[in-house]
Amino acid sequence: EDFGIPLILQSTVIEVHGDERLEAVTIAQVDEQWKPIPGTERTIECDTLLLSVGLIPENELSNGAGVQLDPIANGPKVDDTMMTSIPGIFACGNVLHVHDLVDNVSKEAERAGSFAAQYALQQLPAAARRVKVTAGENIRYVVPHEVSLDKPVEFFMRVQKPQEDVVLDVGGLRSVKKQFVKPSEMLNITLTPEVLSQLSGDTLTVRIVSPKEAGRQ
């Protein structure tokens, strides 16, 4: 509560009050499907309501080309070369998923550009093995959606709900302790080919778990 301003999480505005000017808002807690929970309503007097409704990737070109989209991230599904489901079409930046930092957009663009150039020159090597990447417990989405095991891969993801004192686990191959996670802050983690090659199955699941659960792996 910086400066005495309370932070109310997992709640939404369900009603605004006032005739010629705003006088109050009614808020309510929401469930895991983000639907208001009856009986949790409370009214707060105020004269200003600021809305931050988020960003949605613009994908008219992707839709027109028939690129397969991630229904959660609202961007194209890509592999670790940033190639979409249509060979020769690559995606990066906010068209792929909404980023927090322009630094990550720039790095992603360089990566996509490099692989696109290799593809155009017919120098992009075919992967000997690919695995699907899936979002597990408390992970809303993860990018990329498919990876090979022969190059370093940086994964980006967002959580579904805030949690404290947890562990970010990537397929049981690597775990990182997190003091807290929240949907508004993107998480990222890089796995080397040496680590990725230890995967035994054909699916890599990214999830948020408790330290105790992570210790049982």
Segments from the language model and where they lie:
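Short, aromatic- and glycine-rich surface loops/edge beta-strands on solvent-exposed regions
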Residues: F155, V166-V170, E194-R216
